[in-house]
Design a protein with these regions (language model features):
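Short helix-loop-beta junction
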Residues: 31-42
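Mid-chain, well-packed structural core segment of small domains
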Residues: 55-93
């Protein structure tokens, strides 16, 4: 069974993400997902925002295996989103109490962050 990671971040059209950065971020996320899956992880990217809420995220946590939740740098690195960060942590604790919570801050690559807690297991 592979390690299952949900990477939660802002919708790419969120006002805090500059429009000129959105294509680069989308490409980076797509490459990241492919790289993590190639490394043996079940890696899903989930989009949410304070405006859209966390109901879909909660539903995924309750209905799909989740070993860890990686909170993206757009949330972690923005002090204005600290309450949203707390809501993500709270939702994770409620719906997937055994899941590890990981923060991505762009100073360390995602795989390194994930492998602090998990080594990929073969499928």
């Amino acid at each position: 069974v592979s390690v299952s990671i949900f990477h939660i971040g802002l919708h790419l059209d969120h006002p805090t993400i500059p429009p000129e950065e959105r294509p680069k971020i989308a490409k980076r996320l797509s490459e990241l997902k492919e790289m993590m899956r190639s490394a043996g992880y079940n890696y899903e990217i989930v989009y949410a925002s304070p405006e859209s809420g966390l109901e879909d995220f909660r539903h995924q946590l309750k209905t799909q295996p989740c070993d860890g939740v990686l909170i993206g740098g757009g949330v972690v690195g923005n002090p204005d989103l600290s309450y949203f960060l707390e809501q993500i942590i709270d939702a994770t604790h409620e719906a997937a109490p055994k899941a590890k919570i990981l923060f991505h801050n762009h100073s360390v690559d995602v795989r390194t962050t994930v492998e602090r807690w998990f080594k990929a297991r073969s499928v």
